[in-house]
């Protein structure tokens, strides 16, 4: 199977997994053969479904795509966030962190199942997963992984709790600041007097990290908190990286609330937009030779993030340096730019090649995801 975006679907494509709406209702089952009318409806009529789908195509039969966290857990957690069910959010934070621990999930490699109607909730789930994986790489305990997962799920709780216009009405005049600056403040305001805080189910570590997750390492974040203070807020620096990573990964750039520095915007505009490769390059530049006055992220967090994140997601179609077209089959920790691929068109068609370990293909590399329409109409 491979992952196709909505605009790349073709009549005759066979769904490898069901298509769900944001409430978990299956619209089409696995095994359904897509027709022109199916595809037209998926493109025009459904705003509450994923932008990406798993389909079976010739040559990809042996590729099995499993998201790090199953769709059932994602949907259940998203519904809890949307309905402001804090008890259920706490329970799902344990489910997610335990899956990451027990299934030895160590890489950030999931195709984005987010859709336009539930951006806020899916963003929260993604930030929680990425934060937990980074923290696991850094050696945090099981209890700490539960806490940081919960912090990720709740970090934008105010956005799911109130409309943007109501947030501005309530707080902009009071704090004299932008909406994106007050969201952490408002989230903590909503949570701090609940029984969950009084009983310790939502800890002070969680609250303080939510409050400071927009702070930069150079002290130039929204609240201008110095780095030495941020370090006292246990998970804030991890949430900061995960939050920006997932926001940049979102195709709907209008949803971005983060004021990116000019050098980041320049990088993305000059190098083809916010592709996974460019996003990782952005973090690597911050991790590299920059002065403390320019650094936005904790370098230790970025080091572990870069080790864990996959540049090329499993199941996505990519172009190789020799011109062949392949589908990513597997990623390797610490070698995210050299995955194992299954070649589906070109001189090496039919071969499965481990670009990390196979010494016969040291000169072969992945250039980028396939974007050209003609490469999606291959003669199989």
What are these language model-derived features?
Residues 12, 18, 22, 30, ...:
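Surface-exposed loop/turn and secondary-structure junction residues enriched for glycine/proline
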Residues 53-203:
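Acidic/His-rich, divalent-metal-binding segments that scaffold phosphate/diphosphate chemistry
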Residues 50, 119-130, 144-153, 176-193, ...:
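Hydrophobic transmembrane alpha-helix bundles
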Residues 1-94, 107, 253-380:
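Terminal helices and disordered tails flanking the catalytic cores of nucleotide-processing hydrolases
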Residues 150-161, 167, 176-189, 193, ...:
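Alpha-helical scaffolding flanking metal-ion-dependent phosphate/phosphodiester catalytic sites
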Residues 22, 142, 229-230:
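Short hydrophobic/aromatic segments of transmembrane alpha-helices and their interfaces
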């Amino acid at each position: 199977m491979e992952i196709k975006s909505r605009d790349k679907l073709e009549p005759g494509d066979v769904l490898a997994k069901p298509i769900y709406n944001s409430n978990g209702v299956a619209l089409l089952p696995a095994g359904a053969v897509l027709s022109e009318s199916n595809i037209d409806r998926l493109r025009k009529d459904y705003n509450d479904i994923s932008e990406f789908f798993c389909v079976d195509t010739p040559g990809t039969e042996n590729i099995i795509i499993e998201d790090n966290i199953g769709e059932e857990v994602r949907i259940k957690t998203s519904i809890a966030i949307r309905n402001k069910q804090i008890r259920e959010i706490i329970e799902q934070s344990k489910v997610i962190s335990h899956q990451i621990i027990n299934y030895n999930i160590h890489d950030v490699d999931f195709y984005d199942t987010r859709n336009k109607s539930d951006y806020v909730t899916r963003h929260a789930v993604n930030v929680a997963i990425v934060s937990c994986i980074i923290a696991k790489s850094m050696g945090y305990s099981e209890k700490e992984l539960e806490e940081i997962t919960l912090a990720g799920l709740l970090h934008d709780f105010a956005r799911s709790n109130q409309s943007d216009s109501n947030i501005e009405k309530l707080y902009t005049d009071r704090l004299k600041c932008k909406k994106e600056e007050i969201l952490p403040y408002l989230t903590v305001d909503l949570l701090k007097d609940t029984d969950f805080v009084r009983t310790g189910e939502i800890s002070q570590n969680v609250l303080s990290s939510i409050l400071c997750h927009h702070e930069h390492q150079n002290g130039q974040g929204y609240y201008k908190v110095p780095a030495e203070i941020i370090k006292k807020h246990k998970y804030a620096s991890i949430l900061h990286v995960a939050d920006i990573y997932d926001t940049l990964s979102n195709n709907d750039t209008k949803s971005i609330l983060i004021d990116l520095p000019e050098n980041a915007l320049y990088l993305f505009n000059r190098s083809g937009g916010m592709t996974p490769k460019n996003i990782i390059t952005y973090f690597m530049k911050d991790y590299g030779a920059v002065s403390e006055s320019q650094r936005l992220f904790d370098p230790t967090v970025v080091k572990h993030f870069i080790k864990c994140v996959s540049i090329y997601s499993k199941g996505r179609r990519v172009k190789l340096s020799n011109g062949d077209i392949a589908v990513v089959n597997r990623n390797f920790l610490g070698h995210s730019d050299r995955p194992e691929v299954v070649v589906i068109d070109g001189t090496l068609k039919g071969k499965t090649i481990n670009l990390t370990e196979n010494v016969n293909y040291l000169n072969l590399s992945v250039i980028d995801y396939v974007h050209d329409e003609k490469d999606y109409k291959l003669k199989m």
